[in-house]
Curated annotation (Swiss-Prot):
Keywords linked to the UniProt accession: Chloroplast, Electron transport, Heme, Iron, Membrane, Metal-binding, Photosynthesis, Plastid, Signal, Thylakoid, Transmembrane, Transmembrane helix, Transport
GO biological process: one example: photosynthesis
Organism (species): Populus trichocarpa
Coiled-coil zones: none
Name of this chain's protein: Cytochrome f
GO annotations of cellular component type: chloroplast thylakoid membrane
Binding-site list for heme: 36, 56, 59-60
HAMAP family attached to this UniProt entry: Cytb6_f_cytF
Gene: petA
Entry similarity comment: Belongs to the cytochrome f family.
Membrane topology term: Single-pass membrane protein
Length: 320
């Protein structure tokens, strides 16, 4: 009897342990899979520094172009498109975290004026939904609905990203005004060269941390190298560890200098930023402008008719 109770207790403990382990795995896996797009969010309160530099450039060191297209003017409480273009050569392959080659991903941050925000799904037209595809946008911070981020997403499918934006209504939001506003955008393609903690990724060049002779190169079992540099006068040895991915440029017996590149630079991506302007237009001002234009056109018509009437009178007097 005692043996049965013991076995039953052991089964319960094993089942409980498996359940807890599974829950931890699911939670941890979800966190890891969702962590990559929010690297900047974890480290910076605001993605745009006082100098105008967008913080993504701190990890993506290469400079690449990015484009943005928005309407010149929008009316209050209107949904419009902000199209971000991240061009690159689709044939390029980047170094992945495991050292293998793979396709490039893209990502973007869109900094809108205060009051502008992501349009709710029920306000987005079917045509715009088709352009958006399966993209899922999120706010940079819960309290900063005007700053939107997206990525990483497959670059071959989403090198052009359409953001559905809702303009504010000054009649409902007292802090919104009918003005011209700036919009800032940052877009990257490919992996970064530096992680948020300051450490290097395997998608960058590795330099020698000491001058001397390359006395030994060991190829690691999981990829990458350990390079031993011996300082000839002192006999001091320094070991530089190279992760899998970059190609080695030096060989044993070679004399190298401090900060000399030990590897190639495998990075094929980069980050770019740009800006645009948009006017939140007052409908009354538009109506006033239309009324003014209509008045001018009518005045021109009346002048032409009056001129023709005057010419007829003159002609009749001459005939008389």
């Amino acid at each position: 009897m005692q043996t049965r109770k013991t076995l039953s207790w052991i089964k319960e403990e094993i089942t409980r342990s498996i359940s807890v382990s599974l829950m931890i795995y699911i939670i941890t896996g979800a966190y890891i899979s969702n962590a990559y797009p929010i690297f900047a969010q974890q480290g910076y309160e605001n993605p745009r520094e006082a100098t105008g530099r967008i913080v993504c450039a701190n990890c993506h060191l290469a400079n690449k172009p990015v484009g943005i297209e928005v309407p010149q003017a929008v009316l209050p409480d209107t949904v419009f498109e902000a199209v971000v273009r991240i061009p690159y050569d689709m044939q390029l392959k980047q170094v992945l975290a495991n050292g293998k080659k793979g396709a490039l991903n893209v990502g973007a941050v869109l900094i809108l004026p205060e009051g502008f925000e992501l349009a709710p799904p029920d306000r987005i037209s079917p045509e715009m939904k088709e352009k958006i595809g399966n993209l899922s946008f999120q706010s940079y911070r819960p309290a900063k609905k005007n700053i939107l981020v997206i990525g990483p997403v497959p670059g071959q499918k989403y090198s052009e990203i359409t953001f559905p934006i809702l303009s504010p209504d000054p009649a409902a939001k007292k802090d919104a005004h009918f003005l011209k506003y700036p919009i800032y955008v940052g877009g990257n393609r490919g992996r970064g060269q530096i992680y948020p903690d300051g450490s290097k990724s395997n998608n960058t060049v590795y330099n020698a941390t000491a001058a001397g002779i390359v006395s030994k190169i060991i190829r690691k079992e999981k990829g990458g190298y350990e390079i031993t540099i011996t300082d000839a006068p002192e006999g001091r040895q320094v070991i530089d560890s190279i992760p899998p991915g970059p190609e080695l440029l030096v060989s044993e017996g070679e004399s190298i200098k401090l900060d000399q590149p030990l590897t190639s630079n495998p990075n094929v991506g980069g980050f770019g930023q740009g800006d645009a302007e948009i006017v939140l237009q007052d409908p009354l001002r538009v109506q006033g402008l239309l009324f003014f234009l209509a008045s001018v056109i009518l005045a021109q018509i009346f002048l032409v008719l009056k001129k023709k009437q005057f010419e007829k009178v003159q002609l009749s007097e001459m005939n008389f």
